[in-house]
């Protein structure tokens, strides 16, 4: 039974990722007053399948000066990590119910840095290496903020378990008491997934394509798939942490519909931000974190830590 559940989660994530690429191209198209993909299938709905066939049937090229082992392992590792992150997410029941689910997600997502670093170094290209170093610095920096925000949320829910987070939000979303944290979390997830306006790793005018410049065919597709699955996973996590729906045991499908709708809206917001905002300069990106987000998140974390002590003398309200 576990293997069937695992296959269902993997296939669902892959299908969602495939159609997210189509949605992005459609949204970008309409926002720029053009149609987007509309040739393959009705209204272009089969475009992701055509893209997959094209990429996976092309000849995989290995640069002669590259370190072949790491060069081939890096995209596989990126995709494996992005799939592994889905295991503790409650949809409405998780694949594996960890007591430390949030800690597992934070620790596993930080491993994605290695795939980027290995791909940049193993490609033996200056552009790829600079893109990889940028990505690593950016990801590690913003993980600090994500960890502190998660700690603040845990102080409100009292557990690392994602199911208990949903129980905490049975009557009210955690978005309301912690909206500054939610705003900083959302912006940090943009930076964590290397999306515009924080896509410094793929600065076309400077780095051609970034850390994946030497990749083609199937290996390039694996990086592409990992990036888009991380986007959906991060938005699913945002929904669970700040916008969780009450879990009705009599009709669990209502939770799934609610969860999917909110995740889809947040993902569409990711795409809208890409069309609306120009790319940040690298120093602005780092200043935003180290000079703005970090002091604010630390101050708010201290506030949430001190709240139980400050309110301990207040009698219970009946």
From Swiss-Prot:
It catalyses: a ubiquinone + NADH + 5 H(+)(in) = a ubiquinol + NAD(+) + 4 H(+)(out). Belongs to the complex I subunit 1 family. The gene is MT-ND1. It comes from the Eukaryota. Core subunit of respiratory chain NADH dehydrogenase (Complex I) which is composed of 45 different subunits. GO terms for cellular component: mitochondrial inner membrane. GO terms for biological process: mitochondrial electron transport, NADH to ubiquinone; mitochondrial respiratory chain complex I assembly. HAMAP family: NDH1_NuoH. It holds the Pfam family NADHdh. The keyword Ribosomal protein does not apply. This is NADH-ubiquinone oxidoreductase chain 1. Its EC number is 7.1.1.2. InterPro entries: NADH_UbQ_OxRdtase_su1/FPO, NADH_UbQ_OxRdtase_su1_CS. Its main location: mitochondrion. It is a multi-pass membrane protein. The chain crosses the membrane at residues 2-22, 70-90, 98-118, 140-160, 171-191, 217-237, 253-273, 294-314. Keywords: Electron transport, Membrane, Mitochondrion, Mitochondrion inner membrane, NAD, Respiratory chain, Translocase, Transmembrane, Transmembrane helix, Transport, Ubiquinone. It is an enzyme of class 7 (translocase). It is found in: Mitochondrion inner membrane. One of its GO terms (molecular function) is NADH dehydrogenase (ubiquinone) activity. Core subunit of the mitochondrial membrane respiratory chain NADH dehydrogenase (Complex I) which catalyzes electron transfer from NADH through the respiratory chain, using ubiquinone as an electron acceptor. Essential for the catalytic activity and assembly of complex I.
């Amino acid at each position: 039974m576990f293997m069937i559940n695992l296959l269902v989660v993997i296939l669902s994530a892959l299908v969602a990722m495939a159609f997210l690429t189509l949605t992005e191209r459609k949204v970008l198209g309409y926002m720029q007053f053009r149609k987007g993909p509309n040739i393959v299938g009705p209204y272009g709905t089969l475009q992701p399948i055509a893209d997959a066939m094209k990429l996976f049937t092309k000849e995989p090229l290995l640069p002669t000066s590259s370190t072949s082992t790491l060069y081939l392992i890096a995209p596989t590792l990126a995709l494996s990590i992005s799939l592994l992150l889905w295991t503790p997410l409650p949809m409405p029941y998780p694949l594996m119910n960890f007591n430390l689910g949030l800690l597992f997600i934070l620790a596993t997502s930080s491993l994605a840095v290695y795939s980027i670093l290995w791909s940049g170094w193993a490609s033996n290209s200056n552009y790829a290496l600079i893109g990889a170093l940028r990505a690593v610095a950016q990801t590690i920096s913003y993980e600090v903020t994500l960890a502190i925000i998660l700690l603040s949320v845990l102080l409100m829910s009292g557990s690392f378990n994602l199911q208990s987070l949903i129980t905490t939000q049975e009557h009210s979303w955690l978005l309301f008491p912690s909206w500054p944290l939610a705003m900083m979390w959302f912006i940090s997830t943009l930076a964590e997934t290397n999306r515009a306006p924080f896509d410094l790793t793929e600065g076309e005018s400077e780095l051609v394509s970034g850390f994946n410049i030497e990749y083609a065919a199937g290996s390039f597709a694996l990086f592409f798939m990992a990036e888009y699955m991380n986007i959906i996973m991060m938005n699913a996590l945002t929904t669970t942490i700040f916008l969780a729906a009450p879990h009705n045991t009599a009709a669990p499908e209502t939770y799934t519909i609610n969860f999917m709708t909110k995740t889809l809206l947040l993902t569409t917001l990711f795409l809208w931000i890409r069309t609306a905002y120009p790319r940040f300069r690298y120093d602005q990106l780092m200043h935003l974190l180290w000079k703005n987000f970090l002091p604010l998140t630390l101050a708010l974390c201290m506030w949430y830590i001190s709240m139980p002590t400050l309110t301990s003398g207040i009698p219970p309200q009946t």
